[in-house]
Protein backbone atom coordinates (compact mmCIF):
# COMPACT_ATOMS: atom_id res chain seq x y z
CA UNK A 1 0.00 0.00 0.00
CA UNK A 2 1.29 3.42 -0.88
CA UNK A 3 2.10 5.76 1.97
CA UNK A 4 -0.16 8.73 2.56
CA UNK A 5 2.51 11.07 1.24
CA UNK A 6 2.56 9.14 -2.04
CA UNK A 7 -1.14 9.54 -2.77
CA UNK A 8 -1.61 12.32 -5.29
CA UNK A 9 -4.34 14.84 -4.50
CA UNK A 10 -7.38 14.65 -6.71
CA UNK A 11 -7.56 17.62 -9.05
CA UNK A 12 -10.82 19.49 -8.94
CA UNK A 13 -11.74 20.50 -12.45
CA UNK A 14 -12.84 24.10 -12.67
CA UNK A 15 -15.93 24.99 -14.60
CA UNK A 16 -14.38 27.28 -17.21
CA UNK A 17 -16.60 28.89 -19.81
CA UNK A 18 -15.57 28.65 -23.43
CA UNK A 19 -14.31 31.82 -25.03
CA UNK A 20 -16.28 33.20 -27.95
CA UNK A 21 -13.28 34.02 -30.10
CA UNK A 22 -15.47 34.78 -33.09
CA UNK A 23 -17.29 37.64 -31.37
CA UNK A 24 -14.08 39.10 -29.91
CA UNK A 25 -12.37 38.94 -33.28
CA UNK A 26 -15.08 40.62 -35.32
CA UNK A 27 -15.44 43.42 -32.74
CA UNK A 28 -11.69 44.03 -32.75
CA UNK A 29 -11.50 43.95 -36.54
CA UNK A 30 -14.36 46.45 -36.72
CA UNK A 31 -12.62 48.87 -34.35
CA UNK A 32 -9.08 48.65 -35.71
CA UNK A 33 -8.08 51.65 -37.76
CA UNK A 34 -5.42 54.27 -38.31
CA UNK A 35 -4.11 56.86 -35.88
CA UNK A 36 -3.26 59.80 -38.11
CA UNK A 37 -0.26 62.01 -37.42
CA UNK A 38 -1.00 65.54 -36.14
CA UNK A 39 -1.41 68.27 -38.75
CA UNK A 40 1.96 69.82 -39.60
CA UNK A 41 2.89 73.51 -39.59
CA UNK A 42 1.13 74.22 -36.32
CA UNK A 43 1.76 73.39 -32.68
CA UNK A 44 -1.02 71.54 -30.86
CA UNK A 45 -1.35 71.73 -27.04
CA UNK A 46 -1.55 67.93 -26.81
CA UNK A 47 1.77 67.74 -28.69
CA UNK A 48 3.51 70.56 -26.82
CA UNK A 49 2.60 68.90 -23.52
CA UNK A 50 4.95 66.06 -24.48
CA UNK A 51 8.40 66.89 -23.01
CA UNK A 52 10.16 65.30 -26.00
CA UNK A 53 11.50 67.99 -28.37
CA UNK A 54 12.17 65.33 -30.98
CA UNK A 55 8.50 64.33 -31.03
CA UNK A 56 7.32 67.96 -31.21
CA UNK A 57 9.76 68.68 -34.07
CA UNK A 58 8.58 65.63 -36.03
CA UNK A 59 4.93 66.63 -35.60
CA UNK A 60 5.48 70.28 -36.52
CA UNK A 61 7.53 69.44 -39.60
CA UNK A 62 5.15 66.74 -40.83
CA UNK A 63 7.55 63.85 -40.27
CA UNK A 64 5.41 61.83 -37.90
CA UNK A 65 3.88 58.79 -39.53
CA UNK A 66 0.36 57.41 -39.40
CA UNK A 67 0.21 54.37 -37.13
CA UNK A 68 -2.10 51.38 -36.73
CA UNK A 69 -4.83 52.02 -34.19
CA UNK A 70 -5.47 48.82 -32.20
CA UNK A 71 -8.98 48.01 -31.07
CA UNK A 72 -8.30 48.47 -27.37
CA UNK A 73 -6.96 51.99 -27.95
CA UNK A 74 -10.01 52.81 -30.05
CA UNK A 75 -12.19 51.73 -27.11
CA UNK A 76 -10.18 54.01 -24.82
CA UNK A 77 -10.74 56.94 -27.18
CA UNK A 78 -14.45 56.14 -27.36
CA UNK A 79 -14.70 56.07 -23.57
CA UNK A 80 -13.08 59.50 -23.53
CA UNK A 81 -15.77 60.75 -25.89
CA UNK A 82 -18.51 59.25 -23.73
CA UNK A 83 -16.96 60.94 -20.67
CA UNK A 84 -17.07 64.32 -22.42
CA UNK A 85 -20.73 63.79 -23.27
CA UNK A 86 -21.58 62.85 -19.68
CA UNK A 87 -19.78 65.82 -18.18
CA UNK A 88 -21.30 68.10 -20.79
CA UNK A 89 -24.74 66.90 -19.73
CA UNK A 90 -23.95 67.56 -16.05
CA UNK A 91 -22.88 71.11 -16.85
CA UNK A 92 -25.98 71.62 -18.97
CA UNK A 93 -28.23 70.33 -16.18
CA UNK A 94 -26.48 72.72 -13.77
CA UNK A 95 -27.16 75.55 -16.22
CA UNK A 96 -23.50 76.62 -16.23
CA UNK A 97 -22.34 75.35 -19.62
CA UNK A 98 -21.43 78.12 -22.06
CA UNK A 99 -19.84 76.10 -24.87
CA UNK A 100 -17.91 72.95 -25.79
CA UNK A 101 -14.85 72.32 -27.97
CA UNK A 102 -13.98 76.01 -28.12
CA UNK A 103 -11.26 76.81 -30.66
CA UNK A 104 -8.30 78.94 -29.55
CA UNK A 105 -5.42 79.99 -31.79
CA UNK A 106 -2.11 81.82 -31.73
CA UNK A 107 -0.59 83.25 -34.91
CA UNK A 108 3.11 83.57 -33.98
CA UNK A 109 4.16 80.89 -33.35
CA UNK A 110 1.22 79.03 -34.91
CA UNK A 111 -0.70 77.20 -32.17
CA UNK A 112 -4.17 75.70 -32.41
CA UNK A 113 -6.21 73.87 -29.81
CA UNK A 114 -9.68 73.32 -28.38
CA UNK A 115 -10.94 73.94 -24.86
CA UNK A 116 -13.09 71.04 -23.63
CA UNK A 117 -15.67 73.23 -21.87
CA UNK A 118 -16.36 76.85 -21.05
CA UNK A 119 -18.57 77.31 -18.00
CA UNK A 120 -20.06 80.22 -16.10
CA UNK A 121 -18.14 79.91 -12.81
CA UNK A 122 -19.87 81.45 -9.81
CA UNK A 123 -16.68 83.33 -8.85
CA UNK A 124 -14.58 83.68 -12.00
CA UNK A 125 -17.16 84.12 -14.74
CA UNK A 126 -16.28 82.53 -18.10
CA UNK A 127 -14.00 79.67 -17.10
CA UNK A 128 -12.22 76.92 -19.12
CA UNK A 129 -12.40 73.27 -18.03
CA UNK A 130 -9.85 70.69 -19.18
CA UNK A 131 -11.27 67.17 -18.71
CA UNK A 132 -9.11 64.10 -18.13
CA UNK A 133 -9.70 60.47 -17.17
CA UNK A 134 -7.15 58.59 -15.10
CA UNK A 135 -6.79 55.18 -13.45
CA UNK A 136 -6.92 54.58 -9.70
CA UNK A 137 -3.14 54.48 -9.24
CA UNK A 138 -2.69 57.85 -10.89
CA UNK A 139 -5.81 59.33 -9.29
CA UNK A 140 -4.62 58.45 -5.79
CA UNK A 141 -1.31 60.25 -6.34
CA UNK A 142 -2.85 63.45 -7.67
CA UNK A 143 -2.09 66.45 -5.47
CA UNK A 144 -2.07 68.87 -8.39
CA UNK A 145 -2.55 68.57 -12.17
CA UNK A 146 -0.10 66.38 -14.03
CA UNK A 147 2.56 68.55 -15.74
CA UNK A 148 1.34 67.79 -19.25
CA UNK A 149 -2.22 68.74 -18.33
CA UNK A 150 -1.10 71.93 -16.64
CA UNK A 151 0.76 72.91 -19.82
CA UNK A 152 -2.33 72.32 -21.94
CA UNK A 153 -4.56 74.42 -19.70
CA UNK A 154 -1.97 77.20 -19.43
CA UNK A 155 -1.92 77.39 -23.22
CA UNK A 156 -5.71 77.75 -23.31
CA UNK A 157 -5.71 80.36 -20.54
CA UNK A 158 -3.09 82.49 -22.26
CA UNK A 159 -4.40 82.15 -25.81
CA UNK A 160 -7.98 82.76 -24.72
CA UNK A 161 -7.24 85.51 -22.21
CA UNK A 162 -8.76 83.70 -19.22
CA UNK A 163 -7.39 84.39 -15.74
CA UNK A 164 -8.27 81.00 -14.23
CA UNK A 165 -9.19 77.52 -15.35
CA UNK A 166 -9.79 74.07 -13.89
CA UNK A 167 -8.48 70.59 -14.65
CA UNK A 168 -11.19 68.04 -13.85
CA UNK A 169 -10.16 64.41 -13.40
CA UNK A 170 -12.48 61.41 -13.30
CA UNK A 171 -11.19 58.11 -11.97
CA UNK A 172 -11.99 55.67 -14.76
CA UNK A 173 -12.26 52.80 -12.24
CA UNK A 174 -14.72 54.21 -9.70
CA UNK A 175 -15.84 57.55 -11.25
CA UNK A 176 -14.67 59.70 -8.33
CA UNK A 177 -13.56 63.19 -9.34
CA UNK A 178 -10.87 65.71 -8.42
CA UNK A 179 -10.64 69.33 -9.55
CA UNK A 180 -7.62 71.65 -9.57
CA UNK A 181 -7.82 75.40 -10.11
CA UNK A 182 -4.99 77.05 -12.06
CA UNK A 183 -4.12 80.72 -12.39
CA UNK A 184 -2.86 82.06 -15.70
CA UNK A 185 0.96 82.10 -15.58
CA UNK A 186 2.63 84.46 -18.05
CA UNK A 187 6.09 83.15 -17.18
CA UNK A 188 5.13 79.57 -17.99
CA UNK A 189 3.50 80.80 -21.19
CA UNK A 190 6.75 82.55 -22.11
CA UNK A 191 8.63 79.28 -21.63
CA UNK A 192 6.14 77.48 -23.88
CA UNK A 193 6.48 80.09 -26.62
CA UNK A 194 10.28 80.01 -26.44
CA UNK A 195 10.23 76.24 -26.82
CA UNK A 196 8.02 76.56 -29.89
CA UNK A 197 10.34 79.15 -31.46
CA UNK A 198 13.39 77.00 -30.73
CA UNK A 199 11.82 73.92 -32.32
CA UNK A 200 10.72 75.97 -35.33
CA UNK A 201 14.31 77.03 -35.94
CA UNK A 202 15.81 73.54 -35.68
CA UNK A 203 16.86 72.25 -39.11
CA UNK A 204 16.96 68.67 -37.88
CA UNK A 205 15.36 67.02 -34.85
CA UNK A 206 17.26 65.98 -31.72
CA UNK A 207 18.78 62.53 -32.07
CA UNK A 208 17.37 61.11 -28.85
CA UNK A 209 13.93 60.91 -27.34
CA UNK A 210 13.55 62.92 -24.14
CA UNK A 211 10.03 61.71 -23.43
CA UNK A 212 8.44 58.64 -21.88
CA UNK A 213 9.16 55.10 -23.03
CA UNK A 214 5.93 55.11 -25.04
CA UNK A 215 6.80 58.32 -26.93
CA UNK A 216 5.86 57.86 -30.59
CA UNK A 217 9.01 59.55 -31.86
CA UNK A 218 10.75 56.21 -31.31
CA UNK A 219 8.70 54.75 -34.17
CA UNK A 220 10.04 57.21 -36.75
CA UNK A 221 13.20 56.19 -38.57
CA UNK A 222 15.46 58.26 -40.79
CA UNK A 223 15.50 61.41 -38.63
Predicted regions and their residues:
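Short, glycine/acidic-rich beta->alpha junctions
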Residues: 109-110, 145-150
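Short, histidine-centered active-site or binding-site loop motifs used for metal coordination
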Residues: 132-135, 171
Amino acid sequence: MAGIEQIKPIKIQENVSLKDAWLSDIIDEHLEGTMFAPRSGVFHPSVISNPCDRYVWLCYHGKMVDQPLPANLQRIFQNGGFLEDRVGQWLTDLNILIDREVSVKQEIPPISGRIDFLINHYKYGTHPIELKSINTAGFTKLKKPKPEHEIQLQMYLNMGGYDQGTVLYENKNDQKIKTFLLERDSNQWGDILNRCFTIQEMLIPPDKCSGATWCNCRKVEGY
